[in-house]
């Protein structure tokens, strides 16, 4: 069985302002919760984790967009901002305070900015910002990571692939997040009988772990174009033989979804040769880690890519895939679109509010259609803008809600 990650979350004494925040009331945790609100409106509690580097900048903008799109669709949001990562280390000495975990668990969804920075690189492992993120995922029991990779027509020339290969790419990688070789036991480094050091890890998957990620993938494919490719290494690995067997058996419950199988080495090649053949990909932890990063580069900029991590019943964790970019933090240079699109995923996959999610997605396309670009996606003939102005343009498009061309 996959070993559980030790959280080592410690209670800390917050400054008065943060203690006041943690006293806000929230409903008991379960998937897609809705508290009482104004007549005709639904209310959701959202925990915001700005984190480090450019995180606070992009979270501030995404919050405004989320609030505006929600209000236009009859939704009300109550936001609670909590520290995590390096910001929490500086504030209270640990990367994930117990109060942050409690707030996240009691919310309907969690929106994260970014984690990490040079400042904390030399910290011991348990005091690194990234440890806080791993602990948060473990605390929320998220097991399914959804990462879309879409080449928008406005940005097709930013892709490293030829236009005819990149144009029209729209795929989703569904990665199992808590099992496999990253968590399997036994693991370690030891000295063998010859006195030589040996490092070893174990790829382990139980049937229920495969079944639950496969269900997420089938449901995701059903909402997209109805095609699911399961990626494994069943010609070599026993764990992959079981993976393929379980996914194939589950396909009987989804006759409307076309299932195919592909070995991971071939999948890695096909992603750059003909990425348009893929709709939804489901795979294990380590293969998903690699393939999702590969797929992200097809789009041309990680500043455009959101992600969602889902659990069986509790709140999901939504975040851009880019890092904290401390070298541009506070300079109004960050691209907020990945975080804005993460807010759209929060609405769609976390709360089931697809109309509000579509409003945000259309607004992003609307701003791009008008030619606005941050530095990472800028090209000749477009208008270079900063983080704040890009956010303002998306907000304008949310208000107008003109169906954007794709």
From Swiss-Prot:
<dbReference type="GO" id="GO:0003862">
    <property type="term" value="F:3-isopropylmalate dehydrogenase activity"/>
</dbReference>
<keyword id="KW-0520">NAD</keyword>
<keyword id="KW-0809">Transit peptide</keyword>
<dbReference type="GO" id="GO:0000287">
    <property type="term" value="F:magnesium ion binding"/>
</dbReference>
<dbReference type="InterPro" id="IPR019818">
    <property type="entry name" value="IsoCit/isopropylmalate_DH_CS"/>
</dbReference>
<dbReference type="InterPro" id="IPR004429">
    <property type="entry name" value="Isopropylmalate_DH"/>
</dbReference>
<feature type="binding site">
    <location>
        <position position="289"/>
    </location>
    <ligand>
        <name>Mg(2+)</name>
    </ligand>
</feature>
<keyword id="KW-0100">Branched-chain amino acid biosynthesis</keyword>
<keyword id="KW-0028">Amino-acid biosynthesis</keyword>
<feature type="transit peptide" description="Chloroplast">
    <location>
        <begin position="1"/>
        <end position="34"/>
    </location>
</feature>
<dbReference type="GO" id="GO:0051287">
    <property type="term" value="F:NAD binding"/>
</dbReference>
<keyword id="KW-0460">Magnesium</keyword>
<comment type="similarity">
    <text>Belongs to the isocitrate and isopropylmalate dehydrogenases family.</text>
</comment>
<dbReference type="Pfam" id="PF00180">
    <property type="entry name" value="Iso_dh"/>
</dbReference>
<dbReference type="GO" id="GO:0009098">
    <property type="term" value="P:L-leucine biosynthetic process"/>
</dbReference>
<dbReference type="GO" id="GO:0009507">
    <property type="term" value="C:chloroplast"/>
</dbReference>
<feature type="binding site">
    <location>
        <position position="265"/>
    </location>
    <ligand>
        <name>Mg(2+)</name>
    </ligand>
</feature>
<feature type="site" description="Important for catalysis">
    <location>
        <position position="233"/>
    </location>
</feature>
<protein>
    <recommendedName>
        <fullName>3-isopropylmalate dehydrogenase, chloroplastic</fullName>
        <ecNumber>1.1.1.85</ecNumber>
    </recommendedName>
</protein>
<keyword id="KW-0464">Manganese</keyword>
<dbReference type="InterPro" id="IPR024084">
    <property type="entry name" value="IsoPropMal-DH-like_dom"/>
</dbReference>
<feature type="binding site">
    <location>
        <begin position="117"/>
        <end position="130"/>
    </location>
    <ligand>
        <name>NAD(+)</name>
    </ligand>
</feature>
<keyword id="KW-0479">Metal-binding</keyword>
<feature type="binding site">
    <location>
        <position position="137"/>
    </location>
    <ligand>
        <name>substrate</name>
    </ligand>
</feature>
<feature type="binding site">
    <location>
        <position position="293"/>
    </location>
    <ligand>
        <name>Mg(2+)</name>
    </ligand>
</feature>
<feature type="modified residue" description="Phosphoserine">
    <location>
        <position position="71"/>
    </location>
</feature>
<keyword id="KW-0432">Leucine biosynthesis</keyword>
<feature type="binding site">
    <location>
        <begin position="323"/>
        <end position="335"/>
    </location>
    <ligand>
        <name>NAD(+)</name>
    </ligand>
</feature>
<keyword id="KW-0150">Chloroplast</keyword>
<keyword id="KW-0597">Phosphoprotein</keyword>
<keyword id="KW-0560">Oxidoreductase</keyword>
<feature type="binding site">
    <location>
        <position position="175"/>
    </location>
    <ligand>
        <name>substrate</name>
    </ligand>
</feature>
<feature type="binding site">
    <location>
        <position position="147"/>
    </location>
    <ligand>
        <name>substrate</name>
    </ligand>
</feature>
<comment type="subunit">
    <text>Homodimer.</text>
</comment>
<feature type="binding site">
    <location>
        <position position="265"/>
    </location>
    <ligand>
        <name>substrate</name>
    </ligand>
</feature>
<keyword id="KW-0934">Plastid</keyword>
<comment type="pathway">
    <text>Amino-acid biosynthesis; L-leucine biosynthesis; L-leucine from 3-methyl-2-oxobutanoate: step 3/4.</text>
</comment>
<comment type="function">
    <text>Catalyzes the oxidation of 3-carboxy-2-hydroxy-4-methylpentanoate (3-isopropylmalate) to 3-carboxy-4-methyl-2-oxopentanoate. The product decarboxylates to 4-methyl-2 oxopentanoate.</text>
</comment>
<feature type="site" description="Important for catalysis">
    <location>
        <position position="182"/>
    </location>
</feature>
